[in-house]
Amino acid sequence: MTSELDIFVGNTTLIDEDVYRLWLDGYSVNDAVALRVRSGILEQTGATTGVLQSDTMDHYRTFHMLERLLHAPPKLLHQLIFQIPPSRQTLLIERYYTFDEAFVREVLGKKLSKGTKKDLDDISTKTGITLKSCRRQFDNFKRVFKVVEEMRGSLVDNIQQHFLLSDRLARDYAAIVFFANNRFETGKKKLQYLSFGDFAFCAELMIQNWTLGAVDSQVDDMDVDLDKEFLQDLKELKVLVADKDLLDLHKSLVCTALRGKLGVFSEMETNFKNLSRGLVNVAAKLTHNKDVRDLFVDLVEKFVEPCRSDHWPLSDVRLFLSQYSASVHSLDGFRHQALWDRYMGTLRGCLLRLYHD
């Protein structure tokens, strides 16, 4: 009597998400085993500590072999050694390039060089993130920067194409690349209240409106470099505060429009000229690299802190900035409306994001 037996052979690579997270977080095999034991996995599965140790080591070996492919994610999709379902490939890539908020705040705006890498020991101690994880995150930032810094086209699209990241994560990396390239200061004490999300929001606005790519999508380094011609032209805005008649008329237009609508009207009326000088002088100084780097320091010093000290609610800040920007269009002696809109459209969005405790 003969019997038929169907045999299926599979070699799908198994990915344990919890172990992958421990590996990404920089834990050693022994530390990972201890954490898995603490989670109650032995009771749940009936396994022994020896089996758990072996399982963890197997996963770590797999992740180590996958890491070189994760450095160039399209290679992971096209390799034939590991049979990994597409959904798992996406998870591996996305989590490998995910970063800690506390870590990115320490390196945002710094040069992605060996000098900064030497500081990772201190950053690890300060943030409580393992040194191994800090190195992975820093190397990811540097790798993405090196690949896309010279490319034409949309920064976000280039990152997505070469690293297969989700739209949100690609936008975050675009902000990191943009800040590293322009070396914006983010570490000063008065900026510590700002989150990475605050800076990333502003980066996206600046990329959309202040870069070379905002006016010409065929320009090299389209979304990475600020438009130098635009920054030079911003000096023309100085007339708004240098010309006393224009300054007085601007103030009159804003006060007339906001009387009875602003809870802090008297404070606004008293400080209008100082606030306007602050915002216009920030623009006029952006021809110098140092002043570009200090943009966020200046915005907090010249606008956020004065308004905060007078207890402006966010709703009043929004009303003021809207009217302050729009009223310029009624100044007959002013000839740089398009330049003003390009500057203030972005600045208004940034200031509203920066204005919080």
From Swiss-Prot:
Keywords from the named record: Acetylation, Membrane, Nucleus
InterPro entries registered for this protein in UniProt: FIBP
Superkingdom of the source species: Eukaryota
Protein's UniProt keywords contain Acetylation: yes
Localization annotation: Nucleus; Endomembrane system
Pfam families in the record: FIBP
Main location: nucleus
A GO term, aspect molecular function: fibroblast growth factor binding
Positions of post-translational N-acetylthreonine modification: T2
Membrane topology: Peripheral membrane protein
Assembly notes: Binds to internalized FGF1; this interaction is increased in the presence of CSNKB, suggesting a possible cooperative interaction between CSNKB and FIBP in binding to FGF1.
Protein purpose: May be involved in mitogenic function of FGF1. May mediate with IER2 FGF-signaling in the establishment of laterality in the embryo.
Protein name, as recorded: Acidic fibroblast growth factor intracellular-binding protein
